[in-house]
């Protein structure tokens, strides 16, 4: 598996697990969970996580941006204007061009507003950003995002923070079949087996936050997700057997007593 890298915007990563930095009890807990997960990319909610006020604890004090790739995101934005302003600010603060876009449409279920998302992706791409896009699991919309310049497609498994796991495997398979962009499951995972399933569907990676941060034992869950992603990826590359409604004996038919 040494040469099996996750490639995003021409940069190679050993881990296919991306971890969010929100919802932990402390930055110290967050940093330890990320270390155990093996993740090399972390999402950072620009509007919620302190990355600029030196009078308060900085995320950089706990997670070294020279070792871990920061992926600024627009969590909490409900229209294109908010999202664009947030990511422009992120570029001002840290020079970040690789970003994660999410434009929410509803405060209750946190589904993405795809009209605003599509519009934002097009604008950000023109401005030189490399945009990884949180979206619904609609294959047509995923293709449109690719056409306007997205560098990665990040469909939800289920509503953010729900822990329901992948609800529509068929659509994920269709999206996989029609794009060569990195496909990363984002939102709604609840346990390590969900990550393994995502990888077995052919996804290039998964993003987990609530599933780890709010687990009864976050550190143990971080390690579980690490192993789940690895197992799922290895299973996908190995190639599963064909399904059959009939049995198939595993013992040889010749040389029977």
Curated annotation (Swiss-Prot):
The keyword Transferase applies. It is found in: Cytoplasm. Pathway: Cofactor biosynthesis; thiamine diphosphate biosynthesis. The gene is thiG. GO terms for molecular function: thiazole synthase activity. Disulfide bonds: none annotated. It is an enzyme of class 2 (transferase). It comes from the Bacteria. One of its GO terms (biological process) is thiamine diphosphate biosynthetic process. This is Thiazole synthase. Keywords: Cytoplasm, Schiff base, Thiamine biosynthesis, Transferase. It comes from Pelagibacter ubique (strain HTCC1062). The active site is at 100 (schiff-base intermediate with dxp).
């Amino acid at each position: 598996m040494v040469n099996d890298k996750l490639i995003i915007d021409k940069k190679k990563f050993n881990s296919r697990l991306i971890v969010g930095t929100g919802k932990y009890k402390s930055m110290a807990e967050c940093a330890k969970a990320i270390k155990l997960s093996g993740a090399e990319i972390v999402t950072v909610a620009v509007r919620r996580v302190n990355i600029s006020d030196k009078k308060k604890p900085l995320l950089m004090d706990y997670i070294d941006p020279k070792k871990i790739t920061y992926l600024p995101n627009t969590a909490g934005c409900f229209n294109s204007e908010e999202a664009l302003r947030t990511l422009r600010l992120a570029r001002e603060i840290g020079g970040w061009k690789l970003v994660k876009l999410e434009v929410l449409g509803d405060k209750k279920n946190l589904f993405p507003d795809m009209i605003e998302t599509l519009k934002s992706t097009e604008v950000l791409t023109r401005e030189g950003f490399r945009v990884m896009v949180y979206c619904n699991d609609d294959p047509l919309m995923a293709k449109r995002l690719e056409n306007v310049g997205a560098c990665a497609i990040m469909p939800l498994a289920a509503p953010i923070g729900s822990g329901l796991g992948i609800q529509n495997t068929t659509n994920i398979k269709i999206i996989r079949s029609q794009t060569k962009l990195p496909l990363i499951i984002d939102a709604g995972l609840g346990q390590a087996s969900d990550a393994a399933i995502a990888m077995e569907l052919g996804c290039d990676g998964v993003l987990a936050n609530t599933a780890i941060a709010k687990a009864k034992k976050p550190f143990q869950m971080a390690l579980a997700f690490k192993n789940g992603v690895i197992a799922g990826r290895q299973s996908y590359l190995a190639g599963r057997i064909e399904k059959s409604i009939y049995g198939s004996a595993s013992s040889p038919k010749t040389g029977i007593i």
